[in-house]
């Protein structure tokens, strides 16, 4: 089930959606468009996190999975608009050498690799929290409902964060936007560790994190587009997203190992602070100017 879920998640991931949107939007609108796409995913998290939490209590996890499967199937008819080229005014030219050369050149680009490392940290952070936040809430003696609503608030706050990040892409250098986001995560986690563990602490923590949660996607995708153009944006951003998912695996898995060894997540929180600070610094040397400029017809 995990393997099939991963395939499905990859097939409708941000890289595919942002690549499709980039070829349908003028350059000045792509940042806002990516923010809207990202906000849509966050709205789904806000709506479904408490609903699924209740469904698990009522019908168990299997019944909840069936409910999510039905909702997912309802999205299939919407794909017709994405697979049609009739509304794609931007037609990027094929660079010499095609996809293979584009990927090869990208993987030798230091700025692209630095972007991967920063996004790796984002995945580590998000997967750790999504997987282990309910246990952390339980360790603090609070109801599981607090965890469900915290995840919902993360999704709600990320709608605002994603739209704001999409707008910032057109106003500021994307690498600075990312540096601020990653740095703010380190500060927020440090404040959480110092605060008393009440339900309102978790709610405030969730809102703060939600503002940067997946709001990193618009500036990250924008950087890939600035570096290499939009012709292979879906593929090149997909490779960046792969590092995000590797970080996610380690965040979830290592969180479990740390909990089994210590019965708390203290070491993971400090590791998360260190990685977030590192990600903020890693983005600063990125050369944001277009290195490969692909012509748009």
What are these regions (language model features)?
Residues 36, 45, 227-262:
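A late C-terminal transmembrane helix in Major Facilitator Superfamily
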Residues 37-85:
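Helix-loop-helix hairpin linking two adjacent transmembrane segments in secondary transporters
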Residues 146, 154-158, 164, 169-223:
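C-terminal transmembrane helical hairpin of 12-TM major facilitator-type secondary transporters
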Residues 11-25, 215-228:
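Intracellular juxtamembrane helix-capping segments at the cytosolic ends
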Residues 109-163:
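Extracytoplasmic gate region of multi-pass secondary transporters
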Residues 50-59, 137-138, 168-169, 254-263:
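Interfacial helix-cap and linker-helix signal at transmembrane-aqueous boundaries
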Residues 81-101, 292-297:
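Flexible cytoplasmic inter-helical loops of multi-pass small-molecule transporters
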Residues 1-12, 120, 201-215:
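Hydrophobic core of transmembrane alpha-helices in multi-pass small-molecule transporters
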């Amino acid at each position: 089930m995990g393997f099939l879920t991963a395939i499905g998640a990859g097939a409708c991931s941000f890289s595919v959606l942002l690549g499709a949107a980039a070829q349908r939007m003028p350059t000045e609108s792509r940042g806002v468009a990516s923010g809207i796409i990202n906000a849509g995913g966050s709205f789904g998290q806000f709506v479904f996190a408490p609903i699924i939490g209740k469904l698990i209590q009522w019908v168990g996890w299997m019944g909840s999975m069936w409910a999510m499967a039905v909702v997912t199937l309802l999205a299939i008819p919407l794909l017709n608009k994405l697979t049609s080229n009739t509304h794609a005014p931007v037609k990027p030219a094929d660079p010499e050498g095609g996809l293979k050369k584009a990927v090869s050149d990208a993987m030798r680009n230091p700025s692209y690799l630095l972007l991967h490392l920063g996004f790796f940290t984002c995945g580590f952070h998000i997967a750790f929290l999504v997987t282990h936040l309910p246990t952390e809430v339980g360790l603090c003696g609070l109801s599981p409902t607090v965890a469900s609503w915290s995840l919902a608030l993360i999704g709600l706050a990320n709608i605002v964060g994603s739209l704001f990040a999409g707008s910032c892409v057109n106003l500021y250098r994307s690498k600075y936007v990312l540096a601020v986001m990653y740095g703010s995560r380190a500060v927020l986690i440090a404040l959480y560790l110092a605060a008393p563990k009440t339900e309102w602490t978790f709610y405030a923590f969730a809102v703060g994190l939600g503002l940067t949660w997946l709001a990193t996607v618009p500036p990250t995708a924008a950087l890939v587009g600035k570096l290499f153009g939009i012709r292979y944006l879906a593929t090149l951003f997909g490779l960046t997203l792969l590092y995000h998912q590797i970080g996610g695996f380690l965040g979830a898995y290592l969180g479990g190992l740390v909990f089994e060894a210590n019965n708390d997540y203290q070491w993971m929180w400090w590791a998360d602070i260190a990685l977030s600070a590192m990600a903020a610094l890693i983005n600063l040397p990125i050369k944001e100017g277009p290195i490969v400029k692909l012509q748009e017809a």
